[in-house]
C-alpha cells in the first residue's frame, strides 16, 4: 500500500491543527526548536572539528554564528544596551537571569570573545547538543555532588585568569518564568572573588509577552537586553560574598522589572534571597 497519501493527510491535519490551535502551535514551535538545536549542533560540531580540531573556547564564535540565525525563524528581535561593557580585556564573571529554553539565543546574541559557560553535567549526554557544548569549552558541574562542583569551580578560577577567560553563569541555578528573579546561589560570586575579577551583570527582559509555557503562548516578540556596569571584587574575601550577592541581585532585579515594565508591587518575590554555593 502506498504510504504517501496517508503521510500527506497527516501533514495536512498537522498544519490545520497548528493554524487552529494555540496549544498545537506552541508544541510545534518548541518541537522545531529542539530539531534546530540537534541539527545545528551536529553541523556546528563538524565545522568546529574541521576548524580547530577539538575542544577550545574559540569554537564559541562558530556556535554563536549558528544559534544567532534562530531568531529569524521565530521572529525575535533583540534591543541591546551597554554591550560594549562586555568588551573587557581581562577575565571576568558574567551573570544573567535564566528564564527558558530560549535563553541560549539571548546568550549567543551578545556573547563576547573567549567566553565559556557553566552547565549541569546532565547536558553533556544530550547527543549533538552535549558534543557541541563540550567542543565549545563549556564546564560541566555535577550539582548533586557539592564537593565535586566546588572543585571544578576552584580549578576554573585558576584557569580563567591563566587563559584570560570570561565565564557566563546563571546564578538563579534554574529556569524561572515567575515574573521576578529567584534568589541567587553564591557559586558565581565565590568564583569572582577567588579570581579577583569583576562581575558583569546582564539582564534580559521578561519573555512572558511572547513565550509562556503555562498559557501555551509562543509568538514573535522583542527582548530587551541591558548590560550593567561591572562590579569590582578587588580586595574582597569570602566574608564579603553575601553583600556582593545582594548588591548584584538588587541592581539586576530593579533593571529586570524596569525593562520588563513590571510594577515592583506586582512582582513574585518581595525580598532578595541568597542561597548557598552550588
Curated annotation (Swiss-Prot):
Pathway: Phospholipid metabolism; CDP-diacylglycerol biosynthesis; CDP-diacylglycerol from sn-glycerol 3-phosphate: step 2/3. SUPFAM superfamilies: Glycerol-3-phosphate (1)-acyltransferase (SSF69593). Keywords: Acyltransferase, Endoplasmic reticulum, Lipid biosynthesis, Lipid metabolism, Membrane, Phospholipid biosynthesis, Phospholipid metabolism, Signal, Transferase, Transmembrane, Transmembrane helix. A motif (HXXXXD motif) lies at residues 98-103. It is an enzyme of class 2 (transferase). Induction: Down-regulated in the heart by clofibrate, a PPAR-alpha agonist. Residues 24-29, 143-278 are lumenal. Expressed at high levels in the liver, at intermediate levels in the kidney, gut, heart and skeletal muscles. Undetectable in brain and spleen. GO terms for biological process: CDP-diacylglycerol biosynthetic process; epidermis development; phosphatidic acid biosynthetic process; phospholipid biosynthetic process; positive regulation of cytokine production; response to xenobiotic stimulus; triglyceride biosynthetic process. One of its GO terms (molecular function) is 1-acylglycerol-3-phosphate O-acyltransferase activity. The chain crosses the membrane at residues 30-50, 122-142. Residues 1-23 form the signal peptide. It is found in: Endoplasmic reticulum membrane. A motif (EGTR motif) lies at residues 172-175. Coiled coil: none annotated. Residues 51-121 are cytoplasmic. It is a multi-pass membrane protein. GO terms for cellular component: endoplasmic reticulum; endoplasmic reticulum membrane. The HXXXXD motif is essential for acyltransferase activity and may constitute the binding site for the phosphate moiety of the glycerol-3-phosphate. NCBIfam families: AGP_acyltrn. Belongs to the 1-acyl-sn-glycerol-3-phosphate acyltransferase family. This is 1-acyl-sn-glycerol-3-phosphate acyltransferase beta. It comes from Mus musculus.
Amino acid at each position: 500500500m502506498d504510504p504517501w497519501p496517508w503521510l500527506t493527510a497527516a501533514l495536512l491535519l498537522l498544519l490545520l491543527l497548528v493554524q487552529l490551535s494555540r496549544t498545537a502551535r506552541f508544541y510545534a514551535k518548541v518541537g522545531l526548536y529542539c530539531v534546530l538545536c540537534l541539527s545545528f549542533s551536529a553541523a556546528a560540531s563538524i565545522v568546529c572539528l574541521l576548524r580547530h580540531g577539538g575542544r577550545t573556547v574559540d569554537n564559541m564564535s562558530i556556535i554563536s554564528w549558528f544559534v544567532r540565525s534562530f531568531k529569524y525563524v521565530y521572529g525575535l528581535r533583540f534591543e541591546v544596551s551597554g554591550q560594549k561593557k562586555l568588551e573587557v580585556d581581562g577575565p571576568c564573571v558574567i551573570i544573567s537571569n535564566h528564564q527558558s529554553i530560549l535563553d541560549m539565543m539571548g546568550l549567543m546574541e551578545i556573547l563576547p570573545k573567549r567566553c565559556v559557560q557553566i552547565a549541569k553535567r546532565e547536558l553533556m549526554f544530550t547527543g549533538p547538543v552535549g558534543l557541541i557544548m563540550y567542543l565549545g569549552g563549556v564546564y560541566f558541574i555535577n550539582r548533586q555532588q557539592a564537593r565535586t562542583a566546588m572543585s571544578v569551580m576552584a580549578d576554573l578560577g585558576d584557569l580563567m585568569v591563566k587563559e584570560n577567560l570570561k565565564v557566563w553563569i546563571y546564578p538563579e541555578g534554574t529556569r524561572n518564568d515567575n515574573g521576578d528573579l529567584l534568589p541567587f546561589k553564591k557559586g558565581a560570586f565565590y568564583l569572582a572573588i577567588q579570581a579577583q575579577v569583576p562581575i558583569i551583570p546582564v539582564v534580559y527582559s521578561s519573555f512572558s509577552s511572547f513565550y509562556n509555557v503555562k498559557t501555551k503562548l509562543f509568538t514573535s516578540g522583542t527582548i530587551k537586553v541591558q548590560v550593567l556596569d561591572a562590579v569590582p571584587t578587588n580586595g574582597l574575601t569570602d566574608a564579603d560574598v553575601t553583600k556582593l550577592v545582594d548588591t548584584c541581585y538588587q541592581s539586576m532585579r530593579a533593571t529586570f522589572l524596569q525593562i520588563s515594565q513590571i510594577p515592583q508591587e506586582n512582582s513574585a518575590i518581595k525580598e532578595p534571597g541568597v542561597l548557598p554555593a552550588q
